[in-house]
Amino acid sequence: MKAAVVYYSRSGVTKKIAEKVRAKFNADMIFVEPEKAYKGFASSIIRVIREKKGKKTPAPKTPAADFSAYDIVFIGFPVWAATIPDFLQEYLRQADLSGKRVIPFATAGNNGKEESLAALKALLPDSEITDYFYTSMKEKADADAWLEGIRA
């Protein structure tokens, strides 16, 4: 079983979970970067709001990988404006994950659990999305327990 971890983390919270996934499944890591980096917390919020209002989808700097050799693809992201960051959505549109088992994990301040999962399902209709993990400041979840429950 070959696994990949595709993730973005501005603050390092999502990265910590990505590293746990890598260690447990001996997964390859793919850090997806936006063309223009998001800086501090407050400036990132302002920028995301402006991008949403202007309907500007920022492009990913990271080119879509070839996932043909992978059985499982973990996708990790922070929840921004109740969904997956736009540049990561664009990356996923470019990636061919058809027929792949996709296991998402999301970190959030306080909302977007259902919305981000719905967005992922809409982006990847031909993928099998399982074992969704979500943790937030309001809804704490144990990543180690989640990982132990995943059947590879």
Residue ranges and their predicted role:
Residues 75-76, 104:
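Redox-cofactor binding/interface segments in oxidoreductases and associated redox assembly factors
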Residues 32-36, 55-60, 101-104, 119, ...:
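Short, surface-exposed, polar/charged, turn-prone segments marking secondary-structure boundaries
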Residues 8, 78, 82, 107-110, ...:
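Short, surface-exposed acidic/glycine-rich loop or hinge patches that mediate macromolecular interfaces
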Residues 12, 76, 99, 109-112:
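Glycine-centered flexibility sites
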Residues 1-75, 82-93, 142-152:
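N-terminal beta1-alpha1-beta2 submodule of the flavodoxin-like/Rossmannoid cofactor-binding fold
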Residues 67, 93-100, 122-124:
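Short, conserved loop/helix-junction motifs that constitute active-site signature segments
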Residues 103-142:
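Short, glycine-/small-residue-rich phosphate/pyrophosphate-handling segment
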Residues 2, 26, 99, 126-129:
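A generic structural signal for alpha->beta connector loops
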